[in-house]
């Protein structure tokens, strides 16, 4: 049995950002004919259960001390850019010989070189169960952006608004409500937040699975380790507005990007990646 645990403090809705990646893992484990469940704030101490934790930086010290030795921490943060408190938590977890999974080879290199922690790469692929966004024929939104705001993101969005582009920004909106906005948007915009510039596959894979057109910031400094870049509209920061304008005028090209995205990730069934990392 695998217990996929999402750490969600009271009144902290942002833990729901882990739901799709947790479901990706959960459904692929079920496809392997193994037992799996998704829980919130529940650490199973049964020796026959493996706990895989999302949001481990939200664990308090008491919970960290109670973790079984076979626990797996699934990191989705860009470690180079996280705060010192989380880095200290990572070191505390490492002393307990907890296993670390990460979606990014760059993160894993940072863990090894800076914190002397060896982790395992979790590759992200296609899971049919997550094909569930039914796009609307009539699009009310030109560009959808969801996530935290900072100056570099705000600059692009404000420039689009000044050009009368219908931009919808969401923060703290997850699950079905966010999916409904995706369904009625012409495209989704992905912009780097951190200077580490790791490609945000954890944010984008769900869009690819659902054939949603994605415009993503990609430049010579972007770090990525997947084969899905052919399925998105790649843009450096300076050209991203121009590329958005062009796509908004070309419905066929938008549809083509969405289909290419889905086909690019479909080549890599998640069951194979999950089987490999679990040594099944």
Model-derived regions: residue spans:
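C-terminal "capping" alpha-helix adjacent to the active site of nucleotide-linked donor transferases
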Residues: 236-253
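Short, hydrophobic/aromatic alpha-helical segments in well-folded domains
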Residues: 203, 243, 260-261
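Nucleotide-sugar donor-binding catalytic core of glycosyltransferases
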Residues: 2-48, 55-229, 272, 276
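Short alpha-helical scaffold segments that flank and stabilize functional sites
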Residues: 25, 219, 246, 261-264
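C-terminal low-complexity, acidic/polar tails when present
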Residues: 223-232, 240, 254
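A charged, aromatic-enriched C-terminal amphipathic alpha-helix characteristic of glycosyltransferases
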Residues: 248-280
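Hydrophobic residues at beta-strand termini and immediately following loops
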Residues: 122, 234-235
């Amino acid at each position: 049995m695998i217990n996929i645990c999402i750490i969600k403090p009271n009144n902290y809705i942002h833990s729901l950002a882990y739901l799709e990646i947790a479901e990706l893992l959960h459904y692929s484990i079920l496809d392997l004919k193994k037992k799996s469940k998704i829980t919130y704030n529940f650490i199973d101490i049964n020796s026959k259960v493996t706990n895989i934790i999302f949001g481990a930086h939200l664990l308090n010290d008491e919970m960290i001390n109670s973790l079984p030795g076979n626990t797996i921490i699934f990191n989705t943060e860009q470690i180079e850019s996280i705060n010192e408190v989380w880095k200290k938590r990572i070191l505390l977890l490492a002393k307990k010989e907890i296993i670390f999974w990460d979606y990014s080879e760059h993160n894993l290199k940072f863990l090894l070189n800076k914190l002397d922690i060896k982790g395992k790469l979790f590759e992200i692929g296609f899971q049919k169960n997550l094909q569930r966004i039914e796009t609307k024929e009539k699009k009310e939104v030109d560009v959808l952006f969801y996530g935290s705001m900072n100056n570099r993101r705000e600059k692009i969005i404000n420039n689009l608004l000044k050009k009368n582009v219908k931009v919808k920004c969401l923060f703290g909106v997850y699950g079905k409500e966010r999916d409904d906005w995706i369904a009625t948007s012409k495209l989704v915009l992905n912009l780097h937040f951190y200077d580490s510039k790791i490609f945000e596959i954890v944010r984008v894979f769900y869009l690819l699975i659902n054939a949603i057109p994605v415009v993503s910031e990609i430049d010579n400094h972007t770090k990525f380790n997947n084969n899905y870049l052919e399925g998105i509209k790649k843009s450096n920061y300076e050209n991203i507005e121009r590329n958005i304008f062009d796509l908004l005028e070309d419905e066929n090209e938008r549809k083509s990007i969405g289909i290419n995205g889905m086909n690019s990730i479909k080549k890599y069934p998640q069951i194979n990646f999950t089987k490999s990392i679990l040594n099944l």
